[in-house]
């Protein structure tokens, strides 16, 4: 039973619960296509907090609330500044009196923990500096949609990436295989990796790290990348780009993957940097399906948790 719980990290849930989210995501896609969406959020109010700019997450989440019959109240960085002036605890207490649930894209993951504790309402992680669970759920929905089942994946680029963290969490819970190609200095932090490793041992998941991207993608069905420089990393942008220049997803790299492999990217992409135009626009690209599926995953999560 997920109703009333917060979704801050996938590690908090069983493989059965995670699978139930994926299954409902597929159902929501069918409901939208049939124009018969259940109004599971009717008479409910959802606060959507965005400390960071957002395109896909904001549009998909706002639209999800609307389609489910709810009302969304969007609070951008100029409307709300968590922990600046008013404490996050006080903000959470007030929001908890007004709304039925909170979705938040935050600069500091700890803000999500505080919002959940003090609002006493379900809080959905719409991205933090640590993780992005909605994206990982969307990604593996897309994988299952393409192949009929979950399959092996290679992530190329920054091993400290927040989307990668959630991909690893999903893999560790579901007993899958993930290969990560990155320079040694761009590996997950120990505090992040510790719990993922524990869950992997329980489920039989295999998460391996490579320095050679060609070795990592050999024979895999899914090749995934993300931007090299995230928001807030502008001061180290040039340094990161130099160190990651050999981790671009190219047509040549894709040839080493399975013949029916797909390319994935959570967007926005910096074309010519982490991925070539020929790949993201090519026949193997599943990027636009991913973007569409964000809506259905958001609908499933909102329906189950709030």
Swiss-Prot record:
L-ornithine binds at residues 162, 226, 230-231. Pfam families: OTCace (PF00185), OTCace_N (PF02729). Belongs to the aspartate/ornithine carbamoyltransferase superfamily. OTCase family. This is Ornithine carbamoyltransferase. Its main location: cytoplasm. It is an enzyme of class 2 (transferase). The keyword Amino-acid biosynthesis applies. The lineage of its organism: Archaea, Thermoproteota, Thermoprotei, Sulfolobales, Sulfolobaceae. Reversibly catalyzes the transfer of the carbamoyl group from carbamoyl phosphate (CP) to the N(epsilon) atom of ornithine (ORN) to produce L-citrulline. The keyword Ubl conjugation does not apply.
């Amino acid at each position: 039973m997920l109703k009333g719980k917060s979704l801050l990290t996938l590690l908090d849930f069983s493989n059965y619960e995670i699978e139930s989210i994926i299954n409902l995501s597929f159902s929501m896609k069918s409901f939208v296509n049939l124009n018969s969406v259940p109004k599971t959020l009717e008479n409910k109010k959802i606060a959507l907090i965005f400390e960071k700019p957002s395109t896909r997450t904001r549009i998909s989440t706002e639209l999800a609330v609307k389609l489910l019959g709810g009302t969304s109240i969007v609070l951008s960085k100029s409307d709300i500044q968590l922990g600046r002036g008013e404490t996050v605890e006080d903000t959470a207490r007030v929001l908890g009196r007004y709304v039925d649930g909170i979705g938040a894209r935050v600069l500091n993951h700890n803000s999500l923990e505080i919002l959940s504790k003090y609002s006493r309402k379900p809080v959905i992680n719409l991205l933090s500096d640590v993780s992005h669970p909605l994206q990982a759920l969307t990604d593996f929905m897309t994988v299952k949609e393409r192949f009929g089942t979950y399959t092996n994946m290679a992530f190329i680029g920054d091993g400290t990436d927040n989307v990668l963290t959630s991909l690893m969490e999903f893999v560790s819970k579901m007993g899958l295989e993930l290969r990560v190609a990155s320079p040694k200095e761009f590996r997950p932090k120990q505090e992040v990796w510790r719990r993922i490793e524990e869950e992997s041992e329980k489920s039989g998941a295999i998460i391996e790290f490579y320095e050679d991207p060609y070795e990592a993608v050999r024979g895999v069905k899914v090749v995934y990348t993300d931007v090299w420089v995230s928001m807030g990393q502008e001061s180290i942008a040039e340094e990161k780009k130099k160190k990651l220049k050999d981790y671009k997803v190219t047509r040549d790299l894709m040839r080493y993957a399975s013949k029916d492999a797909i390319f994935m990217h959570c967007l926005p992409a910096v074309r010519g940097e982490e991925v070539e135009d020929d790949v993201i626009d090519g026949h193997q690209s599943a990027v636009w399906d991913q973007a569409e599926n964000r809506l259905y995953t958001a609908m499933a999560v909102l329906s189950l948790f709030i």
